[in-house]
Amino acid sequence: MFIKNYSLVVGKKVLLKETELAFEKGKINHILGRNGSGKSQLAKDFLLNGGRNFSSDISSNTLIISSYSNLPRELTINDFHKVIPWKLSKEIYDLLDIKSIDSSIKLKHLSDGQNQKVKLYVLLSLNKDIIILDEITNALDKTTVGEIHLFLQNYIDNHPDKIIINISHDISDIRLLIGNYFVIDNQKLNKVPSSEHAIKWYLGEE
């Protein structure tokens, strides 16, 4: 996916100005940026398309999974199998080991890690072409983060036609998930050659 001369303005604040968006299929495209740089606003703009930068097919084929894309916490996994209008993916069910989670317990009684796995299972089953992950490992324990990393790597390997954009400030996400690396700096989205370059930039070392 390639968008030229992309700008993002929220209110009177210019977050990105005449930059390029170039995200590769079959890769996890990581975006690092400091607070207030526009990471999450960029994700939302894929759907809102406020600047009319995206074609309608891009907006309609984009899925955002984040802290604000929550599932009803009164439901169980069994409930989702009954009420979700789209087909739930057996592949994702297996990759995330959903069977290890009690399917009769309401989401509000599950751990944060279990909730995140169920969210990924249900929402990724929508089978969208562009998947934006916004801080999805935030506040999760180390074991769950490792399991989600493994899942994402397997998922993109199995679906080379999809684009994954991972917005994160978690250094382990950037270091352990192989992909492309971008930083938001001076209102530009700049590609850097490696995870180490991205991390050094984020830590202010270059």
Residues of each region from the PLM?
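Walker B catalytic motif
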Residues: 135-136
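ABC ATPase nucleotide-binding domain signature region
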Residues: 43-86
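Conserved beta-strand-loop-alpha-helix hinge in the C-terminal portion
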Residues: 188-206
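Conserved ABC ATPase signature
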Residues: 106-110
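Helix N-cap at the start of a conserved alpha-helix in ABC-type nucleotide-binding domains
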Residues: 142-144
